[in-house]
């Protein structure tokens, strides 16, 4: 009888026992914190982003799209990293700018880069279109959000394919839409009204006009957004491909600064 009981208990070695809590061990490939798994602690998730980037601006023009983002990585309110790029070239027809957590942006860059390599290895003459990248990002962001482990980013995707300009938005919840002008972060309050004001009067802009407007908005953001910086990149996509310029800086004028008081 004792031998029978021992043989039965051996089937559950390391498994659940009557009157005790049992934590199901993680499966291979599951995203469980090793420390949490070892000590039976709750699964942890990112509650707040650490190093963050502020606004990204996007604007369509006749024959392409322009995107701009500054090069500051803020650690809370500290201007910690002042020479980081928040714009990436995805392929010859697509570019992407991201605000929010910089580590999550680096992760997405790695994933997208590998996707593009895998597509090119097929050698079938096809590549991801801007709309395809935008659609994939909506699914990826919504998937992570549904697992209660979101990527803390808001992204602007710009591209030019089949004779059409594309400008799309995706946030950390998977919310997505397309628009002639886009702005994330503080730029949604300060820069987007300036972009829309011009587009309402002149719906189709030239490349030069679009660039001048974006540079003006970057200057306004530097004046008014405490998390912005006067060093930025401007990326342009046309039928010729993607071109990223920078670091650039805007001319500023602080002559009236001594007249502003009462906001201390």
UniProtKB/Swiss-Prot annotation:
Q: Propeptide residues?
A: 1-45
Q: Which residues get modified to N-acetylmethionine?
A: 1
List-wise, which residues carry Phosphotyrosine? 102
Has the keyword Phosphoprotein been applied to this entry?
yes
GO CC annotation: ciliary basal body; cytosol; mitochondrion; nucleoplasm; nucleus; proteasome core complex; proteasome core complex, beta-subunit complex
GO BP terms: namely:
proteasome-mediated ubiquitin-dependent protein catabolic process
Q: Which InterPro entries match?
A: Ntn_hydrolases_N, Proteasome_beta4, Proteasome_bsu_CS, Proteasome_sua/b, Proteasome_suB-type
Any keyword Cytoplasm?
A: yes
Enumerate the UniProt keywords alphabetically: Acetylation, Cytoplasm, Nucleus, Phosphoprotein, Proteasome
- An example Pfam family from this entry, by short name, is Proteasome
Q: Where in the cell?
A: Cytoplasm; Nucleus
| Family designation | Belongs to the peptidase T1B family.
- State the function annotated in the UniProt record: Non-catalytic component of the 20S core proteasome complex involved in the proteolytic degradation of most intracellular proteins. This complex plays numerous essential roles within the cell by associating with different regulatory particles. Associated with two 19S regulatory particles, forms the 26S proteasome and thus participates in the ATP-dependent degradation of ubiquitinated proteins.
- Quaternary structure and interacting proteins, as annotated: The 26S proteasome consists of a 20S proteasome core and two 19S regulatory subunits. The 20S proteasome core is a barrel-shaped complex made of 28 subunits that are arranged in four stacked rings. The two outer rings are each formed by seven alpha subunits, and the two inner rings are formed by seven beta subunits. The proteolytic activity is exerted by three beta-subunits PSMB5, PSMB6 and PSMB7. Forms a ternary complex with SMAD1 and OAZ1 before PSMB4 is incorporated into the 20S proteasome. Interacts with PRPF19.
**Official protein name in the record:** Proteasome subunit beta type-4
Its source organism is Bos taurus (Bovine)
Q: What gene makes this protein?
A: PSMB4
